[in-house]
Each structure stands twice: as structure tokens, then as C-alpha cells.
Amino acid sequence: MALWLPGGQLTLLLLLWVQQTPAGSTEAPLKVDVDLTPDSFDDQYQGCSEQMVEELNQGDYFIKEVDTHKYYSRAWQKAHLTWLNQAKALPESMTPVHAVAIVVFTLNLNVSSDLAKAMARAAGSPGQYSQSFHFKYLHYYLTSAIQLLRKDSSTKNGSLCYKVYHGMKDVSIGANVGSTIRFGQFLSASLLKEETRVSGNQTLFTIFTCLGASVQDFSLRKEVLIPPYELFEVVSKSGSPKGDLINLRSAGNMSTYNCQLLKACSKKCAPAPVVIGCLFLVTVVISSKSRAQRNLLAPF
């Protein structure tokens, strides 16, 4: 996970840096600036959840994404079986698809990395989103899952914020105290500071998030998933021999997009017959675990 440069290119820079920097390298940390990530795909789907689910099903978006990403079907199969083995009661309105979306994101590095890159560079405009953003299904269900988990937690515990930690190795962040930033991606952050420690130089974020949701019931780790649209104020920044320490405090939210898939389809999509286009959706609602396992593997 990483922050973005203007234009959404920081993800690629960081990936190249990690791939090209050997373990134990003494090279100077990569220095990057942060901003509000204006080009990141940040849809909150406010007021259109039911319509989004209908469009995703009718448009066979899951199948389209499976066809685009060669590892995708196997990642979802594995995540589905993982969820079946640990399935717990879900909050109101949350479905097994929401749960498996969290599992596939938190457990599969290829999925989370490619989603981050797509959010940065494949949705800079409505037209680009429509043609080039091939994570419409996953993006919606991750966003919706965070919102539903927060709603459930708020109902039980009132307004809920989390103090979490996220570390980035060999990266020096240029962020001024008092400035407002956002990550522009789904960021997994740990509730345990010790889990973020790595060898070498590291930028450690201490994040006070009020829009993130605890996903430890799904990922089996004490972590919180922060949505791409949450804003943060840089409260403090200090240096140490092991790297920078940056404290962030939630400062609301900001989105450029809302219900973008529906807007795109209202312009060019012909009405489709009501069918369950996503075979994955069929399998996850089967109550029998053994039957679900047989049916999950069959379509792929």
C-alpha cells in the first residue's frame, strides 16, 4: 500500500522501488510528496446500493473481471473456501459476497496491488473508468462492506474511531503538518503497532480513522480497512534513526465520483434481462458447505 503522487503515479513508483531494492539495501529512501489524490477512483455509492447490486449482476461484471485477470477466479475461490471455514454471523444487510470480498483483498497481494494500480491510473475520467477500470465488482463490495460494518459498529457502540498503524519500508514521505491528505486507496492498517515493524528505514503512520472498519473477523488479523475517500490532517511529523513518524487524524471525506457505474450505463447500456450473471453469487448463498465447495469450482 502507498500514497499517490499527483496523477496517480506513486503506486507504480513504489512498486518499482520495492521490486528493485534488495533486502538490507543501504540506498537512500525514496522521497515522495502526498496530496489529495484527485485522480483516484473514490466512489462512495451514496444512495444507489440496490441499483448497483442489480447492475453488477445483470451486467456480469464479476465474469468480465475473471476474464481480465488470469489469477482472479482462483483468488476468489480460495477466499470463498477460507470464509466457509470460518463463517460467522454477518451484520444486517451484509452478504457473503461482502465477506469474501474482504478476504480476497486482505489475503491476496496480487488482487490488492492490482486494484490499487487500477484505482490510480485506470479511472482518471468517467470514460476511462467505463472502459479501463476492471475492478468494478470488487470496488463496490469492498466499499459497501466497510460502510455496513461501520453502521453495525456505530449501532452497537456509538460513534467509533480506531487508532491504527501502517508502515512503509524505504519510503520518506513529504507531508507538512496541518495539511490534508488522503490515501486514495483501500488501506489495511494494524491495530497492533508491533505488527508494522520491519527491518531498515520505515515511515510509520499512526492513523486515527473514523471511517475505517475492523475486518479482523474476516482476515484473522487485528486490522482495520480504511476507505480511499477518507481525509486526514497531518497532526505531527518527526524523524528518527529508523525513519519518519507521521500522525494522521480523520478530517472527513471527499469523493469526486458517486454511483459512476450507473451514470455510465444510463448513457449507453441497453436494458438487460434479469439474470444472475455472476456464478460466484450463486455459489456463496448455498447453505450446505460441501455443496457450495463443489459448485464453486465447477464454473471455472
From Swiss-Prot:
Disulfide bonds join 48-259, 161-210. Residues 24-269 are extracellular. Coiled coil: none annotated. Glycans are attached at residues 110, 157, 201, 253. NAD(+) binds at residues 185, 219. Residues 70-255 form the TR mART core domain. This is Ecto-ADP-ribosyltransferase 4. The gene is Art4.
